[in-house]
Amino acid sequence: MYADATHPRRACWCGAGGVSGCVRQRHAYRCSRLLAGVLLIVGALTLTLAVSTVPAAWAAGAVASSDEPVYLLNAMYSLSDYNAKHAKALWLGIDSALHAVGYTAARGRPIKIIEPDPTDDLSDIVAVVLKALKDYPTLLGVIGPYSDTRLGAVLISPEIQNSGLMFLGPFTGSSSMRAWNENLYFMRAEPRLEIMAMVKHIANTFRARRTAFMYLTGEQYGSFEHKSLVELMTSLSLDPPAVYSASYSTSTAVNMTAFDAMADTRPQVIIIWGIPAGQVEELLKVVLTDPRTSSAYIMPSFALQQMTFQVYYDLAMAGKLTPVDGQIISSATSFPLTEPASVHLRVFRAQMGEYMVKTGRVDASLWADEAKAVQQYGPWEHEASSSDSAAYVNNFFNEHPCVTQLMIAGWISGSLIAQTLAEENRIANRTAYRQYMFSQQRYIVGEDFVLGDYGGPCNGVAEFLGAVCYCNQGGHSAVLSRLDRAVWTVITESGVSFTQKNCYSDGTTLPRPLNFLTLIFAEHPLLAQVGLTFKTSISTLVAYLQYNASPVNAATVNVTDTTPQALHDAVTTNYTTDVVVGVTVKGMNVDGYLVPSPIHPRPHLVELLRNYVYLMPTLEQQMFVLYAKLSAVRGVTSIDSAVHMILHGYASDEVANITAVLRKSAATFNYDNPTVTAVPSTKTVGSALAHGQINFVLAVTAADVADIVDFLVEEKTSIVVIVFDDLVIQYPTLVTALKSKPASVQARVITFTNLPLWSDTSESAHAASKLLTVFHDALPDPSQHTPGFLSAVLTGSFCASMRRLADSVHSTSLTDMVYREGSVTTFAEPFGRFQWGCTTTPTDRFCVYHNYGAQGIVMLSVQRMLDPTVPQLSSPMTPTMDYRPRQRSHALTPAQRGGAIAGIALLTVILLAVAGLALYCCMDNRNNDAAPKDGDEPVTLLFTDIESSTALWAALPQLMSDAIAAHHRVIRQLVKKYGCYEVKTIGDSFMIACRSAHSAVSLACEIQTKLLKHDWGTEALDRAYREFELARVDTLDDYEPPTARLSEEEYAALWCGLRVRVGIHTGLTDIRYDEVTRGYDYYGDTSNMAARTEAVANGGQVVATEAAWWALSNDERAGIAHTAMGPQGLRGVPFAVEMFQLNAVPGRRHAALRTEIEAILPDDTATDTASSAAGALLSSVGTINGPAAGIAFVLASCFAPYPVAQRVRELQPLLSKWGVGAPPRSRLVSEEDYCQGLMNRLAIRIATVSQARCPVGNNGAAVDLDVQHAGTAEVMNPLLGEGSFISDGARARHSGLTAVPPSAEPSAMRMRRVGRKVPERPTVCNVRGAH
């Protein structure tokens, strides 16, 4: 609840001055403390003069002796036939609570109830009270009275006001009587709270557009509540109710003129407020039987609950209506006995049961009609009469639900009264009693029903410190109960309450709800499912986030007529709505409601309506992105740029409009116009799909999905592109049809989205997207991980953000908030900029109507949806939607066309003559279109290499040939797909150049996923890799194999076949065209840096330098799972380089980066290829062991007789034979160290190959590979795996190298070594010198 005011409600009673008739006015209004004080003084003086004949003991309160009874007058009665039983039930509840304490007050003083003399005129409540005062001078208080009329009469009596009597728990039906008066002690919440509970339910649950309010004028009941009702409904943007009002009369006739005026509005909810009387009873009968009102919800106040119950079931038993569960909903300030969680109700049941059995004062025959209705329509079985008192009590409670609730209300008041009499000094006289009652009292009844705080006059300091001032009522809450099978049941979350700091609810308002409405197309199952998806998603999101800023309600309306007008009527006729979500149709203009992310059964162009806000990609945006990213689409199967659009079920004007926009997109990016085919709705699109082209299909149906799948299975190069709306609607059908098809088919069904991948539940995806984390936590069921559910969650969150903004600026329009904010971010997902309006300048007028805001749109395939490790097809793009004319040469003049025609014949002859020569000359030419050629623009270079290729060739020669061929095919296909350029290959290594850093990164990541998914036809490669890792465990103390100890399931998900490492770097290069190779090559620092980056990576790992990483846009970086590896040292680089691991396959673990310490360092002018550089000579003198050490000793012994220079020359044939590179010697390295380094390197190679060949036969079966002592320049290096691995990335580790200035010599695939002085130490090569 919201409380705007903290001032208590106080009454400056005109009746205190003896002015007659004032009671019929509203007696409650705000007044200052000064005014209140003045009026109290004046009133006191007037009262003194008016009651000079009253005994003085009345004012001060006579002091009672310690054994004298505590006298209380029972004024809880009514003389009306309609109200007498009502008041009787309240009194029995009060009496049962006093019976429970033995009618005993403090120090054993008996409590004596004074019953009015039946011979007196009981209608004159003032006379009844004055007579009791006269007969019992120590009378402490009055219980009651019953009804607002009698209470008003008491309050205008000067004698009673001056007596100091406390009126305890008066039963009133209108808030007009609730005001500060020190003689009144209310023990029920004010009736205004009942109105608030009703309005809350109407706004949040019924969401009814048409309400009615029925009350009687001329009495306190109704007038004040009608005013409160209108104020509350206006604050929630609800229409004011239709009104039936008639003057109170003893006549029971219904004013049919007033009733007809109300009934003709066809109210959905009718609130009835009034005195329980014959006039109200007749009105209820008319309401429940008139066809205009009989189906409406009936909401009586608590005072009318019993009467409404009886009339309803009397009509049912007479055959005039059929009871409907939940049609009758009553307000109350206490719970019915069916509420299971309330402790005080269990206490009530026990005390009232004992009271019934022991006193016999409860006569069930008084309410026999209620019992008869329950016996016929209720769920209880009447227990046979017996001596069992428990059965008797249980029968009574079951068969008298309304009487029981009245008894509960009375019992709560009686229990509070009993507590006020529990201390002797409180009840010495009326003055002491009243002082106690208003001394900041709070009461707890039955352990959990709280009343209070009650407080009297106090100053501002006390109020500031927390005191409750001028407060004579203790209830602060109300609830609603629904009537189901003659049983009252509390409606969950129907209650309202306000802070106990405030005495009355004046100024307390209800929070505005956020109401969603979704249309359910009942005759179209897929469209209906989309609507239900929105309802489920929004409700679940609200529950998960525990959103309580305002009530959020998601309702649905079933529709069969799907014409725009019918849908408009469905939205606007019956329900209060803020937001319309889900499926809509073109032309359904629902002005006044926000329509975010509309889903169209037949996608169409943006509707320029201010309240339509497109959060998902529009058709125009998707067509723009299609041509902007057409090269990526073409690369899937390497087809040309021809686009064929198929429009299914569109009218001719829509075909023309959509075609025009698509052609503008094609012209903007200098592509030829698409071909267009319109397919009628009576056919499927199968026959219209074009072979070998990109098919852009709109309005896909379930039958179309089957045609598309069959078409793609047959056509190996064709591609089908669908839009986001069709994806949402047909997603279940698409996934079901494609999940069993080959990946090559799944990869050729492509769509658009600006959402994170809904099916990606990996940790890296959650780390990159807050929206995805919330989505999967709120909806953990994998069947709900669909684009429809995710877009619904996002839409709901967007609208909730707009509601918060609207409330903060006291606006009623969510649409206004969208354009006021312009750019909106929800769960870190940006939208906008939304603009709507015109700007006028002295010379011109500019208008912008921009109601769409999707950003970061990507293209992705169904393959990626089924397998999140597959990269998305394109980088994120926020289309500018700036169209340009196609850029091409001017048309030929007529003369030029004539000359061209004349020359065609000659040209044909020439072409035929030179065709053979041209073909011959062009056979060796390379396609250089994709090569970056501008030396002023940065180029991104990739280097790749296969891990342990030498060892694999030695161990599996019969398999490696096919494996290398497959490796080359995969990489070359991807190079073409991403528009990159193959510079050269050296052995199994690739050098690749890309114009775009994102293309390079996407290429590198997809290399890993493609190789993972490739069918290698053998497991021998994986067994060999695992054995290589295990062989290192015994060699290195803290080495932990990254993959060898994985379970089969884990390994199969992360690794398969050849392991390729990739290094990426971006920078400026020296670009040269090679006349021999007829291709472009790239030289300089960028090439060297990329090669060195690849050299430090592990197999299956992609490492990018910070230059490559920051060359990506913010959106591109956000879409890439990565691990920052910190600064790393690279050979030949005089500074540490920040490295980033790209997590192409989530879950892979790698050894630490291969930043080995070099000792054999070439001269500044030395160069080497990327692969050779990665295996430079190690500082291995005295460090190698095992077989390699033995081989090195033999070599050293054999060559020892020769001088050092001759030894180096004699080693060259052996080095060449074993494929070991011999880089030039650096000036910083001695000849002896250089010689020993060459022999060590040769020894390691010999040991590796010989041991690898032993255990693996030609059939591919592997046995234990004992290679723990072998090391190679590529991977079989004992230092390469040093350290342990970490999840999803290699541990950052610095090499500690000291760099020297790099060489200026350009080289495409060679690397400079880092200069480092190796300490002098004796070696086998200089044994002779040592002697």
Curated annotation (Swiss-Prot):
Gene giving rise to this polypeptide: RAC-B
Lineage of the species this protein comes from: Eukaryota, Discoba, Euglenozoa, Kinetoplastea, Metakinetoplastina
Record-linked PANTHER family: ADENYLATE CYCLASE, TERMINAL-DIFFERENTIATION SPECIFIC, ADENYLATE CYCLASE, TERMINAL-DIFFERENTIATION SPECIFIC-RELATED
Glycosylation sites: N255, N429, N558, N574, N657
CDD domains from the UniProt entry: Nucleotidyl_cyc_III
Segments on the Extracellular face: 55-898
A Gene Ontology biological process term: intracellular signal transduction
Cellular compartment(s): Membrane
Topology within the bilayer: Multi-pass membrane protein
UniProt protein name: Receptor-type adenylate cyclase B
Catalytic activity annotation: ATP = 3',5'-cyclic AMP + diphosphate
Pfam families: Guanylate_cyc (PF00211), Peripla_BP_A-cyclase (PF25493), Peripla_BP_A-cyclase_1 (PF25495)
Enzyme Commission code(s) on record: 4.6.1.1
Gene Ontology CC annotations of this record: membrane
Membrane-spanning parts: 34-54, 899-919
